């Protein structure tokens, strides 16, 4: 029978506080790296709890900085914690955490945008996509400057089942600038509904967990921060290639305040624009006077399916780029003022 001590929750031995580590290594948040430290362990514990049960889990933490969330992850009883940190100033403090945890922390000095996460963890953790999510998690207080390109990269990897999703439906618990968090989770008719809403919600169950006031960070950002949890679906809500979905959604939200037919129209070259726009909306059974924020996921699914059929019939259609057409018109002095604005 297990002793009470064996059941005790894992706790790090006494260490300098996060604030003391910041002073010890003379750490300052770098504005150009969009760094904001979260030093309140009650808040970092709350973030980690939203990731779910991390007992014996394998976790990748993005941008650990001075190690606030890192400590909370270790205290959750993980088997292994991989931290990917770009800033060399934080490496000594992270090594200190590794020693205190008995070697549970593996530190990689590198950029998460280029790090090969498909090689991050043991192969025995891989689960079938149809199974429950693997015991692998991504957690991070993301710098504002990389949060959007990073989540788009990961969403594409969800679609392709590559990168961290080689292991299965890996869950993500991440912080974003509050406005980005609201876009990720915005529903139909919400003013924050955007390209990011569709791209995340067609692939994942997305939850806006809670908001952290900006004053909790050092230095204090001008905005609050939202904690978002994403779990990939077994079956995406739109079953088309990621690049195709992204193109359709991007074009439609190019004119977010206008009727949706404006955005649909720029999927097609000028000489056949009117005809194919009418055809696509008719076949998808979408009201051309709906605005992008009013379109449901079902609308986008139908639009993507019809566009795929049109591209199959005309292989050159998918490679058409509206912005390239505008650039050529501008060079020839034939563009309108409105078209010039779109190139800004």
From Swiss-Prot:
GO cellular component: mitochondrial matrix
PROSITE patterns: SAM_RNA_A_N6_MT (PS51689)
Domain of life: Eukaryota
One record GO biological process: rRNA methylation
Membrane-spanning parts: none
The keyword RNA-binding is annotated on this UniProt entry: yes
CDD domains associated with the record: AdoMet_MTases (cd02440)
Family: Belongs to the class I-like SAM-binding methyltransferase superfamily. rRNA adenine N(6)-methyltransferase family. KsgA subfamily.
Protein function: Mitochondrial methyltransferase which uses S-adenosyl methionine to dimethylate two highly conserved adjacent adenosine residues (A1583 and A1584) within the loop of helix 45 at the 3-prime end of 12S rRNA, thereby regulating the assembly or stability of the small subunit of the mitochondrial ribosome. Also required for basal transcription of mitochondrial DNA, probably via its interaction with POLRMT and TFAM. Stimulates transcription independently of the methyltransferase activity.
Name under which the protein is recorded: Dimethyladenosine transferase 1, mitochondrial
Organism: Xenopus laevis (African clawed frog)
């Amino acid at each position: 029978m297990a002793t009470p001590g064996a059941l005790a929750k894992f706790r790090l031995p006494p260490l300098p506080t996060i604030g003391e580590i910041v002073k010890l290594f003379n750490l300052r948040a770098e504005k150009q790296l969009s760094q904001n430290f979260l030093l309140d362990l009650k808040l970092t514990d709350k973030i980690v709890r939203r990731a779910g049960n991390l007992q014996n889990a394998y976790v990748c933490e993005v941008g650990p900085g001075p190690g606030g969330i890192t400590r909370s992850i270790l205290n959750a009883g993980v088997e292994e914690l991989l931290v990917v940190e770009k800033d060399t100033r934080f490496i000594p403090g992270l090594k200190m955490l590794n020693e205190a945890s008995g070697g549970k922390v593996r530190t990689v000095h590198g950029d998460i945008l280029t790090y090969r996460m498909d090689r991050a963890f043991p192969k025995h953790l891989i689960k079938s996509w149809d199974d429950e999510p693997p015991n692998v998690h991504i957690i991070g207080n993301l710098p504002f400057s990389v949060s959007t390109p990073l989540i788009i990269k990961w969403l594409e990897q969800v679609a392709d089942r590559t990168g961290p999703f080689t292991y299965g439906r890996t869950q993500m618990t991440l912080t974003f600038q509050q406005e980005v968090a609201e876009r990720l989770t915005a529903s139909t008719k919400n003013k924050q509904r955007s390209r990011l809403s569709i791209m995340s919600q067609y692939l994942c169950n997305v939850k806006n967990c809670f908001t952290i006031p900006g004053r909790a960070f050092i230095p204090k950002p001008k905005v609050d921060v939202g904690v978002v949890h994403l779990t990939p679906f077994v079956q995406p809500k739109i079953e088309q290639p990621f690049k195709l979905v992204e193109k359709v959604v991007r074009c439609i939200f190019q004119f977010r305040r206008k009727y949706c037919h404006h955005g649909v129209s720029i999927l097609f070259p000028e000489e056949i624009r009117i005809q194919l726009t009418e055809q696509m909306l008719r076949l998808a059974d979408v009201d051309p006077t709906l605005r992008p924020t009013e379109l449901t996921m079902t609308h986008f699914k139908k639009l993507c399916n019809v566009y795929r059929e049109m591209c199959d019939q005309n292989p050159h259609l998918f490679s058409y780029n509206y912005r390239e057409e505008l650039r050529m018109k501008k060079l020839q002095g034939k563009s309108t003022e409105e078209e010039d604005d779109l190139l800004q």
